[in-house]
Regions:
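Beta1/beta-strand and adjacent pyrophosphate-binding region of the FAD-binding site
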Residues: 1-12
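C-terminal helical "tail/cap" subdomain of flavin- and related membrane-associated enzymes
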Residues: 1-2, 64, 232, 276-277, ...
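Conserved N-terminal helical subregion
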Residues: 2-4, 21, 46-150, 154-167, ...
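Conserved Rossmann-like nucleotide-cofactor binding loop
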Residues: 12, 35, 142
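Glycine-rich FAD pyrophosphate-binding loop
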Residues: 21-41
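Flavin-dependent oxidoreductases
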Residues: 161-191
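FAD/FMN-dependent oxidoreductases across multiple families
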Residues: 184-186, 194, 202-276, 282
């Protein structure tokens, strides 16, 4: 039986392990944290990610802990709508709505698909040592494996955006399922969770590394005067349910996702800004494609060559599209520039938003052998 070592026990690593086991590999997941991640706020998975989960055999289990998202749109801080998303039309084309989860619930659903002895926690893999037929580097945006394989690559760089994420402690009534508000160099978004609580994020331009002693008070200062229900969402959130992190991306594309028999997946390969909401879905696509090619190609090397050939162009295009979306959306500053953008969005038909989503979420997964 072929063996694989997966470095990293996040969503990308767990999904890769599930896929490899489904095509007959023996897999061990190595995670630095002493306890596999139950932290985090919310996360959304688009139709392509849901199709990947179905191929991996965990789609139903994941849907059971997620909330299918209906309508939504973009508005300005005063509350006026710039555009609406026809979620039903998008779901008809894509075959699935967007699902939103507590990250911890999605993580647990993936973990439950793996035997306990597959997961090894509290270990640090300082360097890639070939003790398996394949090493899957799923160790995130600041991947050590990537740095070892491509020492001349500049690595992840700060994208100019910092993000605060929270989850309300009780259900909060919202007008739509997916609500996104664009201001000047700032964005506030929210999605409904399965139990009626709301996951929210506040993204804004800031210098790298700036932190605040009272994060919720800072959010109230920045966003408390924006339209309802934003003040209510902040008021319904406990300080312990708030996370703050800077956004990093691989602005310089990697020359390859494969070196010898080490393959990079997820953020280790193609870290992107969150402005398209495609990060998790692209990692899930990676997992399916890697397993499918290893199950169908004659040799491991041929499978990895195919993975690199097919995944690198698609994911790097998504990285670029996410960056561009952020530049014209959340990151845009200047009264004239913002007014021009808003006017352009108002006269754009709602079908354009559906087309923009479909461009990256429409994906036909390969079958697992």
């Amino acid at each position: 039986m072929k063996t694989a070592m997966v470095v990293g026990g996040g969503i990308a690593g767990l999904a890769a392990a599930i896929g490899l086991r489904r095509v007959g590999w023996q897999v061990r997941v190595m995670e630095r944290a002493a306890v596999l991640d139950d932290a985090g706020a919310g996360i959304s998975v688009q139709a392509n990610g849901m199709r990947a989960l179905d191929v991996l055999g965990v789609g139903d289990a994941v849907r059971a802990v997620g909330a299918a998202q209906g309508g939504g749109g973009i508005r300005i801080p005063e509350g006026k709508w710039l555009s609406h998303m026809d979620a039903e039309a998008a779901a008809r084309i894509l075959g699935s709505p967007v699902y939103s989860f507590l990250r911890a619930d999605l993580h647990r659903a993936l973990r439950s698909a793996l035997p306990a002895d597959c997961l090894v926690t509290g270990v640090t893999v300082d360097e890639v040592v070939r003790t398996a037929d394949l090493v899957v580097a799923a160790d995130g945006v600041h991947s050590r494996r990537r740095a070892q394989l491509f020492p001349d690559h500049p690595g992840a760089v700060y994208a100019g955006t910092t993000v605060v994420r929270g989850v309300t402690s009780a259900p909060v009534q919202t007008e739509v399922d997916i609500d996104q508000t664009w201001g000047h160099g700032a964005e506030f978004g929210s999605t409904r969770l399965l139990d009626g609580r709301v996951e929210w994020h506040a993204a804004y331009n800031a210098a790298e590394g700036v932190r605040h002693d009272d994060l919720l008070s800072e959010m109230a200062r920045r966003f408390g005067h924006w339209h309802a229900p934003i003040p209510a969402l902040l008021a319904a959130t406990e300080p312990g349910a708030v996370l703050h992190h800077d956004v990093y991306e691989l602005r310089t594309p990697l020359p390859a996702y494969v070196a010898d028999r080490v393959v990079l997946v997820g953020d280790a390969a193609h870290a992107m800004t969150p402005h398209l909401g495609q990060g998790a879905s692209q990692a899930l696509e990676d997992a399916v494609c890697l397993a499918a090619y290893l199950g169908s190609e004659a040799t491991i090397d041929e499978a990895l060559i195919r993975f690199d050939r097919e995944r690198r162009p698609r994911t790097q295009a998504v990285v670029g599209a996410a960056r561009q979306t952020g530049r014209i959306g959340q990151q845009l500053q200047g009264r004239f520039a913002v007014a021009l953008r808003n006017a352009g969005i108002r006269i754009t038909p709602s079908s354009a938003a559906v087309k923009a989503m479909v461009k990256y979420a429409l994906w036909e997964p390969p079958a697992l052998g």
